[in-house]
Amino acid sequence: HHMLQTATSRLQNTGAFLSDMVKWGESARIRAVTDDFTGLYNRRFFDDALKDSIQESILNGRPYSLVILDLDRFGTLNAEYGEAVGDSVIQAAVPVFIGVFDESDILSRYGGDEFAFILPGKTGEEALERCRKVCRGLRELEIPALEKGSFDHLSASIGIATCPIHGENTQELLDRADQALYAAKEAGRDRAVLYGMGKMK
């Protein structure tokens, strides 16, 4: 009887221990794929997701749009207001992205003030429409910390490329989204450009 009790309590403890391990594993997994600062996916996860998305797109003939977004003049903003304000600006931008894009979209912080998104099933035109909403949302953000300097609002430049029409591998697609991003900056920033629109370099 005593042995049975010991075995039972040991099993219960083991059960608790295992569920802790599972929880710990889960949070470690989540930590491994997310950017601590914004809660969005990190670059490593994004790169894998992009490869998978391209394969899926080619296999099923569904469009997948890749979006690259840079916050405008972020280096200047950091220099003028300090990095703490720069950080708060990045955190203020994230809810705008989450509000505009769908739950099935993959949103990542790609580096400093650069973000990259994968929009499964969305054509370039549909992606462009969403990205214009992002530009509007960022412009309309009220960030009190910016009022004391030369930035009267936040804005972003956005480049979009769609698989399979603009590229069928990671490098092609990233290059074309980058070219579109460059075109957005050249045209005066605070806008979204779809690869192939207007004057592309």
Task: Enumerate the predicted regions with their spans.
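Short catalytic/binding micro-motifs of nucleotide second-messenger systems
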Residues: G99-S104, R136-G149, T162, L181-A183
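Short regulatory alpha-helical coupling segments
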Residues: R29-I30, R43-P63, G75, V94-D102
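Heptad-repeat coiled-coil signal-transmission/dimerization helices
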Residues: F46, L50, V67, V89-I90, ...
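Conserved nucleotide-binding and Mg2+-coordinating catalytic segments in signaling enzymes
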Residues: A28-D48, L69-G82, Q91
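Alpha-helical scaffold within the catalytic cores of cyclic-nucleotide enzymes
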Residues: V94-P95, E126-A145, D178
